[in-house]
């Protein structure tokens, strides 16, 4: 599980185009970033997540293990992973096209009553890693945040 978390953390998604539909959740005002709360219904099915994400563009959903969504302005992507023997929702990755990690960290800490701590051993010049544990949706989760000069990627995962 940690290998999957690390691999997803180092991957960023970029895209071109898109529409400017103002009804899509997680949309940004140009020059700002908006925290997006993904589906945290751990163990749920792909159909449940698809219903939750109905306002987003499904970029990839061709298998039973992952769904990838983008908001209309391509400033936020959300990847859902369905791992384990039951293929229930077990990991969520949200990537923001922004350099404003402090805002995202603050929102996570405030919403989920947790502290994200800088991981000096994993951080390098231009790349900073934060981690923490908390409870979301009644489940203990691990949170890993990877910040570069252009993106902030947050990985939420259940440890079991």
Predicted features, each with a name:
Residues 1-2:
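Bacterial N-terminal signal peptides that target proteins for export
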Residues 79-81, 118-120, 140-146:
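Short amphipathic beta-strand and strand-loop transition segments with alternating hydrophobic
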Residues 131-150:
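Short, exposed beta-strand-loop hairpins at the edges of beta-sheets
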Residues 146-160:
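Short, low-complexity, Pro/Ser/Thr/Gly-rich segments in the mature regions of secreted, periplasmic
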Residues 11-15:
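C-terminal motif of bacterial Sec signal peptides marking the signal peptidase cleavage site
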Residues 110-134:
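Short Gly/Thr-rich strand-loop-strand
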Residues 16-117, 156-160:
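Short helix/turn-capping signatures at newly exposed starts of structured segments
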